[in-house]
Curated annotation (Swiss-Prot):
GO biological process: one example: positive regulation of MAPK cascade
Keywords annotated in UniProt: Developmental protein, Differentiation, Growth factor, Mitogen, Secreted, Signal
Name of protein: Fibroblast growth factor 4A
Organism: Xenopus laevis (African clawed frog)
Record-linked PROSITE patterns: HBGF_FGF
Length: 187
């Protein structure tokens, strides 16, 4: 090989390297997406990776909260071991719920002590379910007063609500403008 013919492959490699660096972002590797997938995979394997606080909620972080409804004397929603759901004025072990995102803006409510999910049937009645199903999904909406409303995902227009005596109200008889559908997540 002569000297000029040896320079041709070097020039081609150099040109290819410059072209790869100048590619549009859509053709380059997306480290953010790959980091999120790695984090999701590590969580399913029981490992915990460090992530930023902002992305944790989007990645399926479970929040343990008590949902407080400021109606009547004020009640915390509780899930009892027999599947009944009602409100109790004072905090107790059955009022601790685990809120888990299942889709964007949709959560499931799980009674930590009772081991049951909050669910709503077609008539708007709340009940405790041992197994997760479509009736256990609720759309979480942040209201202007900084309270949350929980609308059934399967039955739109039906909301979780507590009456002034602490008993649940049927979801089809309430609207998000009524204070008995407003819940404040408390730690």
């Amino acid at each position: 090989m002569t000297v000029p013919s040896a320079l041709v492959p070097i020039l081609l490699l150099g040109t290819a390297a410059v072209m790869v660096q100048c590619l549009p972002l859509s053709f380059q590797r997306n480290d953010t997406v790959e980091r999120r997938w790695e984090t999701l995979f590590s969580r399913s394997m029981g490992e915990k990776k460090d992530t930023s606080r902002d992305s944790d909620y989007l990645l399926g972080i479970k929040r343990q909260r008590r949902l407080y409804c400021n109606v009547g004397i004020g009640f915390h929603i509780q899930v009892l071991p027999d599947g009944r759901i009602n409100g109790m004025h004072s905090e107790n072990r059955y009022s601790l719920l685990e809120l888990s995102p299942v889709e964007v803006g949709v959560v499931s409510l799980y009674g930590v002590k009772s081991g049951m999910f909050v669910a709503m049937n077609a008539k708007g009645k709340l009940y405790g379910s041992r197994y997760f199903n479509e009736e256990c999904k609720f759309k979480e909406t942040l209201l202007p007063n900084n309270y949350n409303a929980y609308e059934s995902r399967k039955y739109p227009g039906m909301y979780i609500a507590l009456g002034k005596n602490g008993r649940t109200k049927k979801g089809n008889r309430v609207s998000p403008t009524m204070t008995l559908t407003h819940f404040l997540p408390r730690i």
